[in-house]
Each structure stands twice: as structure tokens, then as C-alpha cells.
From Swiss-Prot:
DNA binds at H101, R124, R169. It catalyses: Hydrolysis of DNA containing ring-opened 7-methylguanine residues, releasing 2,6-diamino-4-hydroxy-5-(N-methyl)formamidopyrimidine; 2'-deoxyribonucleotide-(2'-deoxyribose 5'-phosphate)-2'-deoxyribonucleotide-DNA = a 3'-end 2'-deoxyribonucleotide-(2,3-dehydro-2,3-deoxyribose 5'-phosphate)-DNA + a 5'-end 5'-phospho-2'-deoxyribonucleoside-DNA + H(+). GO terms for biological process: base-excision repair. Involved in base excision repair of DNA damaged by oxidation or by mutagenic agents. Acts as a DNA glycosylase that recognizes and removes damaged bases. Has a preference for oxidized purines, such as 7,8-dihydro-8-oxoguanine (8-oxoG). Has AP (apurinic/apyrimidinic) lyase activity and introduces nicks in the DNA strand. Cleaves the DNA backbone by beta-delta elimination to generate a single-strand break at the site of the removed base with both 3'- and 5'-phosphates. Pfam families: Fapy_DNA_glyco, H2TH, zf-FPG_IleRS. This is Formamidopyrimidine-DNA glycosylase.
Length: 288
């Protein structure tokens, strides 16, 4: 599943291609994603201009502003995209016939009329493409966004933030991080990696971790995610960036998917356990 780094890599790739371009038309081939695609989406998008491409957690947020043809009452709207398990957004600068799993095309043009196509592909159809009317404040109240935790690169996110929000919590720290209500985007791969960097065993009760150890964990989360973004994310199955390139963070993973292999720090064999139906990897010597 694409996690925060993969979504951010996609966003960074889309920004120079989409920002300021006018949407010529949208073609929906399959409406049956995780939630049905609005049948009116082509009409809602046509003629609008992409103002910004943002990210909140694992959601891509594409702001589409109206032109005069939409009438004086028309306001900004947002395209919310979640990549699900196997979704990708590709920018096509030359025409290409759609494949079986290419569910949505958004055709855009710049001021000179040069066309590009934004194509959404999702073999398993667990992703989502939703429309939301309103400004950014209204968007933040969307049911899918309003309960998300803080962004890991927000300056307010630190050890004190995590310590204060985990008092009395008996659940394992990895389970708490994956829930996303304290900090967003620390998915399964990067959770194992961050906990290793911080020297914290993933089964440790969140409420028993000290303030200094949370400071180390907050820094490890930021560093791990930043490294992953710089390496184009992780490609475990289907993920590619908007340019079609695979990520390679997983090639240098410290613990993830390395069960039985020697720890890169101390040489102890990496262990694998299951937490909440997800595989967890850790070093029993380095993580306490």
C-alpha cells in the first residue's frame, strides 16, 4: 500500500505538471472504486484550473478553481485521491491507449494549449477519487480528514507531543502509530524502520515510553520519512511515481522484510512477528 512517502513523491511529481493548467475534460471508465466515483465528476471538473496540489496524510488534495463560465456562485472545489493498495497517478505527455485498470483520465492544457493527461490506474480498485466543494477550511472538516493526526513534518510534532498523547495507553507503540490519530503517515514499513532507529521495541506499551525516548522516536520518524521521500518511496508491488519510476528505499531497509538476516548494526538475526494482522520486523538486541 502506498504510504506517506509514496504519496508525497507522487505529489511532488504532479505539482509542476498540473499547477496552472486548465482541465479540458475528464473521462471516467469505471465508477466502482472504494467509494463510487460521482457520475457528475466530468461536468464538475471541466473548465476548471488546477491551483494547488497538496497532501494530507495519504490523501492527495487537488484544488480546482472555476472560471467565469461556471457562473458567479461557483466556488473552489477539491479532488480527493487515495491510492488504496495499488493505485497510481501518472502524467502522460504523449497519448497512450488506456489499459484494463486505467479508470480515470483528466486531460489538461497549458496557456498555449499543449495537452497532458493525468491517468489514475488501480488494479484492485481499493483507492478513491472524490469531489468536495468548498475552501480549504471546509475541506479540513471532511469526514475522511478531520480526525487525522498531526503531519510528521509539522514543527509542533516532537517528543512532547507524542508523550502527552500516549499517557495511560496500554496498546503497543506500533499499533498506536499505525492508528494515525497521533501522527499521520507512519505506515507499516516506516513504522518498523522508525522504531528501529529509535531503539524501541514495537511491542512496548505506548504509555510506558519515556519523554526522552519519544523525542528520539519523533526524530526517527521524520528522518525515516525524509529518507524515503528522497529515495522515491518504496516499491514492493505496484507503486511507481507520477513519472513511472519505482522507488528504492526498501533496498536499504534496516529491518523491514529482513527476517532472519543479520542486523545491520549488531549482527543479531532480525525477528518477525504479527501485530494487528501486519508483519513487524525488529532487532531483539538493538530495540528494548
Amino acid at each position: 500500500m502506498p504510504e506517506l512517502p509514496e504519496v508525497e513523491v507522487t505529489r511532488l511529481g504532479l505539482v509542476p505538471h498540473l499547477t496552472g493548467r486548465r482541465i479540458v475534460r475528464a473521462v471516467v471508465r469505471h465508477h466502482g472504486l472504494r467509494w463510487p466515483v460521482d457520475p457528475a465528476l466530468p461536468e464538475l471538473l471541466g473548465g476548471r484550473t488546477v491551483a494547488r496540489v497538496l497532501r494530507r496524510g495519504k490523501y492527495l488534495l487537488i484544488e480546482c478553481v472555476p472560471d467565469i463560465a461556471h457562473g458567479p456562485q461557483a466556488g473552489a472545489g477539491w479532488l480527493l485521491v487515495h491510492l488504496g493498495m495499488t493505485g497510481t497517478l501518472r502524467v502522460l505527455e504523449t497519448p497512450a491507449a488506456p489499459g484494463t485498470h486505467d479508470h480515470l483520465d483528466i486531460e489538461l492544457a497549458d496557456a498555449a494549449g499543449r495537452p497532458i493527461t493525468l491517468r489514475y490506474r488501480d488494479p484492485r480498485r481499493f483507492g478513491a477519487v472524490l469531489w468536495h466543494d468548498g475552501d480549504e477550511a471546509a475541506l479540513s472538516a471532511h469526514p475522511l480528514l478531520r480526525n487525522l493526526g498531526i503531519e510528521p513534518f509539522d514543527t509542533r510534532f516532537d517528543g512532547d507531543w507524542m508523550y502527552a498523547r500516549t499517557r495511560g495507553r496500554s496498546a503497543a507503540i506500533k499499533t498506536v502509530l499505525l492508528a494515525g490519530d497521533i501522527v499521520v503517515g507512519v505506515g507499516n514499513i516506516y513504522c518498523s524502520e522508525s522504531l528501529f532507529r529509535a531503539g524501541i521495541r514495537p511491542t512496548t506499551a505506548a504509555g510506558r515510553i519515556s519523554r526522552p525516548r519519544y523525542a528520539a522516536l519523533a526524530e526517527a520518524i521524520r528522518a525515516t520519512l525524509a529518507d524515503a521521500i528522497a529515495r522515491g518511496g518504496s516499491t514492493l508491488r505496484d507503486f511507481v511515481g507520477s513519472d513511472g519510476q519505482s522507488g528504492y528505499f526498501q533496498l536499504d531497509a534496516l529491518v523491514y522484510d529482513r527476517a532472519g538476516l543479520p542486523c545491520r548494526v549488531c549482527g543479531t538475526p532480525i525477528r518477525q512477528i504479527v501485530q494487528g494482522q501486519r508483519s513487524t520486523f525488529y532487532c531483539p538486541a538493538c530495540q528494548r
